[in-house]
Amino acid sequence: MTVQRLVVVGGSLAGLRAVEAARKAGFEGSITLIGAERHLPYDRPPLSKEFLDVTDPGVEAPIPFFRGDDVFADELMVELVLGAPATGLDVHRKIVFVGDQAIGYDALVIATGSQLRTLPDSEHLDGVHGLRTLDDSLAIRAALDAGARTVVIGAGFIGSEVASSAQKRGVDVTVVEALPTPLVRATGTVMGAAIASLHDRNGTTLICGTGVEALEGDGRVQRVVLDDGSVLDADLVVVGIGVSPCTSWLEGSGLTLDNGIVCDETLWTGVPGVYAAGDVANWPNPMFGVRQRMENWTAAAEQGATAARNALDPEHAKPYETVPYFWSDWYGSRIQFVGVPESEEVLLVDGDVDNDDRWTALYRQGGRIVGALTLNGQTVIMKYRRMIAQKASWGDALEFAEKRRASALAKATASNE
């Protein structure tokens, strides 16, 4: 069947890239973009990075919108349905429901992303925020500007970026992490500890292996009670304990839901005309032969485009294969990771994690390099990503690292002569 109506549910990066890819592929039919937020699609990473980092009085950080109204209307020719989430899906009649509104489709890309996990019994307190949306970031930035005593719950990437912004302002900040070592799922135990040491080096208190018993206050948060009995005074609490895929609206739709929407390697859900992309897509990555659900900018952009192209031409659908990539900025340093952290060996091939502000670690599985983690290694990280994509051997990766080390040493020696 020829596709005349493309509907994209999700007004963030994956949804936008789906729309753009459809038009770039020559699709001339109607496109409807449904977004739960009232804002035009905007870039999320800056919300916990440079958007929070603006500290100069009178300087307003630009809101990171991807495109203006005129681009959506005139260039992409998209009907925008913003400010209300999708509430249901009828795959037999090919209808997406947004409240009482029924929107028909021939092809559908679901890119509803993820939602923040919250602490129980915290909804009644002002001053408690997650960080997922533009409105979240605006509220947190206002509190930091006012000098709020800040407690960040969860030492993951988002929470740590908030702590970095607080520290930049000279705000008193403490990070609380329930696990003994932060970032284990993202980078492994050894390197998680190495990254977490950036907090201590920059004067941020990090408490690990301790959970939160309760948040206390009279209408507004005043204290964080930890499960070891200690109490932290707080005017602002930022909760960064992870996310879960936004799939509740799809219950009973016929789609398979298991840690997201279960897809095949082409991002097809198994239901005619329906594809998924971004945080919500659980798909088998042919690069590593494992099922993944990725929560990063790169995957959202790539999957959104792939899902749209495949939805418009399912007979020629192509698998989505990738080497995952994410980055995070803390205290003026950039952390970058490519690949997967599941490995038999992690080897530091450049620098010293305890003393240097630049280092590189590689991850081995069998005889192959499967991951690389760098601190301030912007010039090398994508070279390792290409090596992983090419399924380079561990020996080749070590040889490459040694050549880089020797070259750097030679340059340093020459400059000192």
What are these regions (language model features)?
Residues 1-9, 66-151, 227, 238-240, ...:
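FAD-binding core/adjacent interface of flavoenzyme oxidoreductases
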Residues 2-5, 280-378:
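Mid-to-C-terminal Rossmann-like scaffold of FAD/NAD(P)H-dependent oxidoreductases
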Residues 4-27, 151, 158-167:
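N-terminal Rossmann-like FAD-binding beta1-loop-alpha1 element of flavoenzymes
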Residues 12-16, 38, 114-116, 135, ...:
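Residue-level detector of alpha-helix initiation sites
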Residues 21-105, 187-205:
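N-terminal Rossmann-like dinucleotide/flavin-binding domain of flavoprotein oxidoreductases
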Residues 126-147, 219-225, 230-306:
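FAD-site-proximal beta/loop scaffold in flavoenzymes
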Residues 149, 157-214, 296-299, 319-327:
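Rossmann-like dinucleotide-binding cores of NAD(P)H-dependent redox enzymes
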Residues 353-415:
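C-terminal auxiliary extensions adjacent to catalytic cores
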